[in-house]
């Protein structure tokens, strides 16, 4: 509105200026001629008089022109003052909000390690049932052993899965006292070949490794999709596992399926690794017992894995190289999560090392200390969270057995432990089996 008023003022000034010049021109044309000299032909006969008259007219015109210049200057000055007084600041165009570019989700293949169990169908059925996207989660079944019935089961899925076969089915030369471990040698050879295919042939950036006797939870894919960026960003992590070694039903909080932890123990049994880690491990991959080899300090290098409160995998395979002993004693009791958790919508930054160490250690060592006997007899029920302190290998094993958690150690690291601390539920109470606060590292001689 103000801009229109200012423009109108300029227009009127210009009109007045033009009108004034028109009147001036009319004035000169209609101005009466001054009285002549006595002789009517005096001016015509006297050139000097004519010159004086022309000069006088020119001077009059110059004076009038100067007055017009002054008038025009006043118009300009008044316009400038008016514009300054009523000037409306020109608002800068609103800045476009910065919308972060969300990278497309990574393609994370599921590598199923198969051999001679036709029950791989149960594993594949669950994977395909819960898989949200065939493009984001291609399923690659790598088969060893040359078992034809298992091969037919895998082939029956057609293009829903990719079937690859480990070509070297020969026996492996081993020491005489290791002949009974031939199966462990073949497993290590198969893992090396299959992971090589994933990262060198298919060129994937990461992979989730699943054995053929595992059943997955409804949010299995959601869990790994959400934790993949965390694994990529945090160099203090080297894997994400779907497994809680102490995940028996009575030892987990079923009301908190979203709860995740860091652990120094390599759990396996459905785990995510990056191509960069495989590039590090492949040149020194062991000939046998690959999982225990992963748990050695030379491979772990102080790094941790992410693990859930409630397992996202469950093993149903009693048949295997361990002859079912570990399955009967422990594995079959692990609870499989059934409640879908939208992990990709949750803030998982609490799992980054600095924040996690600060908060987790404050919680553990801020909990009241209670003797193991009082925990077992459920004394001090009002204490919903307690700490049981051990001081050495023997006391750890004794307390772990008394409380029902796994008591074995691999290179000094307890199963599901973080900084020596094992967290679980006992009779509905949160218990931290922990070393003294002065703990300064694992002792690899503890086994």
Swiss-Prot record:
Substrate binds at residues 117, 144, 190, 212, 322. Residues 30-447 are lumenal. SUPFAM superfamilies: Nucleotide-diphospho-sugar transferases. Mn(2+) binds at residue 213. InterPro entries: Glyco_trans_13, Glycosyltransferase_13, Nucleotide-diphossugar_trans. The keyword Membrane applies. The active site is at 291 (proton acceptor). One of its GO terms (biological process) is UDP-N-acetylglucosamine catabolic process. It catalyses: N(4)-(alpha-D-Man-(1->3)-[alpha-D-Man-(1->3)-[alpha-D-Man-(1->6)]-alpha-D-Man-(1->6)]-beta-D-Man-(1->4)-beta-D-GlcNAc-(1->4)-beta-D-GlcNAc)-L-asparaginyl-[protein] (N-glucan mannose isomer 5A1,2) + UDP-N-acetyl-alpha-D-glucosamine = N(4)-{beta-D-GlcNAc-(1->2)-alpha-D-Man-(1->3)-[alpha-D-Man-(1->3)-[alpha-D-Man-(1->6)]-alpha-D-Man-(1->6)]-beta-D-Man-(1->4)-beta-D-GlcNAc-(1->4)-beta-D-GlcNAc}-L-asparaginyl-[protein] + UDP + H(+). Its cofactor is Mn(2+). Keywords: Cytoplasm, Disulfide bond, Glycosyltransferase, Golgi apparatus, Manganese, Membrane, Metal-binding, Signal-anchor, Transferase, Transmembrane, Transmembrane helix. Its EC number is 2.4.1.101. One of its GO terms (molecular function) is protein N-acetylglucosaminyltransferase activity. Pathway: Protein modification; protein glycosylation. It is an enzyme of class 2 (transferase). Initiates complex N-linked carbohydrate formation. Essential for the conversion of high-mannose to hybrid and complex N-glycans. Belongs to the glycosyltransferase 13 family. This is Alpha-1,3-mannosyl-glycoprotein 2-beta-N-acetylglucosaminyltransferase. The lineage of its organism: Eukaryota, Metazoa, Chordata, Craniata, Vertebrata.
């Amino acid at each position: 509105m103000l801009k229109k008023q200012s423009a109108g003022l300029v227009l009127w000034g210009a009109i007045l200026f033009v009108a004034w010049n028109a009147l001036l021109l009319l004035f000169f044309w209609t101005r009466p001629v001054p009285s002549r000299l006595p002789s009517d032909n005096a001016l015509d006969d006297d050139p000097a008089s004519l010159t004086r008259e022309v000069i006088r007219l020119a001077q009059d015109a110059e004076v009038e022109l100067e007055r017009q210049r002054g008038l025009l200057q006043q118009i300009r000055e008044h316009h400038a003052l008016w514009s300054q007084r009523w000037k409306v600041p020109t608002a800068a165009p609103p800045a476009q909000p910065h919308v972060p570019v969300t990278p497309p989700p990574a393609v994370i293949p599921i590598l199923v390690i198969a051999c001679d169990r036709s029950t791989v169908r149960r594993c594949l059925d669950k994977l395909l049932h819960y898989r949200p996207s065939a493009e984001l989660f291609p399923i690659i079944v790598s088969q060893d052993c040359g078992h034809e019935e298992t091969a037919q089961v895998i082939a029956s899925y057609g293009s829903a899965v990719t079937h690859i076969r480990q070509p070297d089915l020969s026996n492996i030369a081993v020491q005489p006292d290791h002949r009974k471990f031939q199966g462990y040698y073949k497993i290590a050879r198969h893992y090396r070949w299959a992971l090589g295919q994933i990262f060198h042939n298919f060129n994937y950036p990461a992979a989730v490794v699943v054995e053929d006797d595992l059943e997955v939870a409804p949010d299995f894919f959601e869990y790994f999709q959400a934790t993949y960026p965390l694994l990529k960003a945090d160099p203090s992590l080297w894997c994400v596992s779907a497994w809680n070694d102490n995940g028996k039903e009575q030892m987990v909080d079923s009301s908190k399926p979203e709860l995740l932890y860091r652990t120094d123990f390599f759990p396996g049994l459905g785990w995510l690794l990056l191509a960069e880690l495989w590039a590090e491990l492949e040149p020194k991959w062991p000939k046998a017992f690959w999982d225990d080899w992963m748990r050695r300090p030379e491979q772990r290098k102080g790094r941790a894995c992410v693990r859930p409160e409630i397992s996202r995998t469950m093993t149903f395979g009693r048949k295997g190289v361990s002859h079912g002993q570990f399955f009967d004693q422990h594995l079959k009791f692990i609870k499989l999560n059934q409640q879908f958790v939208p992990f990709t919508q949750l803030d998982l930054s609490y799992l980054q090392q600095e924040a996690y160490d600060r908060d987790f250690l404050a919680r553990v060592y801020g909990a009241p200390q209670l003797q193991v006997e009082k925990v077992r007899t459920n004394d001090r029920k009002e204490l919903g969270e307690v700490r049981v302190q051990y001081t050495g290998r023997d006391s750890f094993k004794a307390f772990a057995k008394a409380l029902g958690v796994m008591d074995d150690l691999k290179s000094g690291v307890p199963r599901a432990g973080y900084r020596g601390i094992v967290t679980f539920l006992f009779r509905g109470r949160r218990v931290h089996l922990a070393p003294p606060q002065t703990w300064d590292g694992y002792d690899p001689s503890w086994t």
